[in-house]
């Protein structure tokens, strides 16, 4: 009888060891936007399998619209929204959606630029001018207008705004349909044939406005609360994977360019330009200064009429990030 039991036990152990790793790994559904600047970070995470290397079984859910991940997490269709718009993340938390903001992943990086031959010499000269920027309601728009107001004394009534996406704004500027534009560095790198002059950095001006060292946060990672409660270690591992991906991208920009060529059907030149902006665009941090920067941003959005309620302090959960820093 004992021999039979030993044989059965050995068989069960052998069967367990023969189960493929993905079936043993913690499952999670992760959504990200594949048409914006979150594409770079998301593609590297997905293609290089950083989360899987932490023992996670990830189903990547891709969205064609910027608010797709936040809408999906509201309905609990995904467990994690990666690089979701920061203002929307705080907005759904303020509305009572059971989510936790656990990581800052993308910087609201942009430059205020004019054509090289423009008579405009400084940001203060933009009074009465037409400025191209992201549409009202976006985090970048709220940040840019707040900087113009607080740092340069330019009220919204002092200039007109031409809204558009990055490609449209670049075209407006090159065709002299606007006097200045608020454009991301990756866009500027892709239109090198157009000679531009930089008047100011959104990141630098934000730090003056917020009186801190944290950059303005464009995107965050948010987790459905029930998933986090049941799988705290899995979320910490995902954040650790994100931190590893950040370092990889910084050190392997040519490889990032190759990934982007395939993932986004970019030309080699555009993919290289995109990859070279990695260090200025992405982060994987959730320190007190990052949270303070997020809250300051949301205050600005509220002041502009884009929100009415504050996200509760409990929506900012540093626990997973703290645990992730102890994981290799």
Residue ranges and their predicted role:
Residues 229-306:
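Secondary-structure end/capping motifs
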Residues 87, 168-260:
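Pocket-lining segment of extracytoplasmic ligand-binding domains
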Residues 8-18:
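Bacterial N-terminal signal peptides
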Residues 19-25:
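Sec/Tat signal peptide C-region and signal peptidase I cleavage site
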Residues 49, 53, 203-214, 280-289:
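Short, solvent-exposed loop/beta-turn-alpha elements that line the ligand-binding surface or hinge
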Residues 26-163, 172-175, 179-185, 199:
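Short, glycine-/small- and polar/acidic-enriched structural segments
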Residues 295-328:
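Conserved C-terminal helix/tail region of periplasmic/extracytoplasmic solute-binding proteins
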């Amino acid at each position: 009888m004992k021999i039979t039991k030993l044989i059965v036990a050995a068989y069960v152990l052998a069967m367990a060891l023969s189960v493929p790793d993905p079936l043993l790994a913690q499952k999670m559904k992760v959504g990200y936007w594949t048409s914006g600047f979150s594409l770079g970070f998301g593609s590297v995470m997905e293609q290089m399998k950083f989360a899987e290397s932490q023992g996670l079984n990830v189903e990547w859910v891709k969205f064609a619209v910027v608010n797709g991940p936040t809408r999906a997490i509201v309905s609990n269709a995904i467990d994690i929204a990666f690089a979701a718009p920061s203002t929307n993340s705080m907005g759904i938390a303020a509305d009572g959606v059971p989510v936790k903001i656990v990581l800052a992943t993308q910087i609201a990086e942009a430059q205020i630029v004019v054509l090289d031959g423009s008579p405009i010499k400084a940001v203060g000269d933009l009074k009465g001018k037409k400025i191209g920027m992201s549409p009202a309601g976006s985090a970048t728009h709220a940040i840019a207008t707040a900087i113009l107001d607080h740092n340069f004394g330019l009220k919204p009534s002092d200039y007109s705004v031409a809204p558009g996406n990055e490609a449209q704004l670049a075209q407006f500027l090159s065709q002299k349909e606007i006097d200045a534009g608020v454009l991301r560095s990756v866009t500027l790198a892709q239109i090198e044939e157009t000679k531009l002059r930089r008047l100011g950095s959104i990141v630098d001006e934000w730090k003056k406005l917020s009186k801190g060292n944290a950059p303005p946060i464009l995107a965050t990672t948010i987790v459905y609360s029930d998933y986090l409660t049941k799988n705290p270690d899995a979320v910490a591992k995902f954040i650790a994977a994100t931190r590893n991906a950040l370092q990889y991208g910084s050190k392997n920009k040519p490889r990032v360019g190759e990934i982007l060529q395939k993932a986004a059907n970019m030309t080699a030149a555009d993919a290289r330009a995109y990859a070279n902006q990695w260090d200025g665009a992405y982060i994987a941090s959730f320190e007190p200064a990052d949270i303070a920067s997020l809250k300051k941003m949301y205050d600005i959005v509220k002041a502009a009429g884009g929100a009415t309620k504050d996200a509760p302090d409990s929506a900012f959960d540093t626990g997973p990030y703290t645990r992730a820093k102890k994981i290799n």
